[in-house]
Amino acid sequence: ILNAQLQSIVSLLEYVETTDDPGARAFTERMLTATRELLPRFDTGCWSLYSLNGVDASPSYHSYHVRLLRRLARLTGDPLWQETAGRWAGYQRRGGC
């Protein structure tokens, strides 16, 4: 479930920023790596998937995905998150599939 994965990473990043916990930092990096690798599988080319079982995200979850990706972009500085958020926001403006 994509929103849960993204929200978990956001929360972990905020925790690490506050505590500087090395174990949490390492775990967060592993979560980021796994999510970077899986993210293309959540992109249908015209919408986001709610989960890898192939169910399209509802409009509200698709919007939430975009917001979380933008938050990750701000927290990490990794352009992948902003690029994906921009592409998915475009899907929304065009009305999806």
Regions found by a protein language model. Give the residues of each.
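Terminal, non-catalytic domain-edge segments
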Residues: T18, H62-C97
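Non-membrane alpha-helical structural segments and their capping/turn regions in soluble enzymes
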Residues: L2, L6, P22-E29, P59, ...
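Long, well-ordered core segments of solenoidal/helical folds
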Residues: P22-W47, E83-C97
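H/E-rich (His + Asp/Glu) clusters that bind or coordinate divalent metals
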Residues: A24, L38, F42-L72, D78
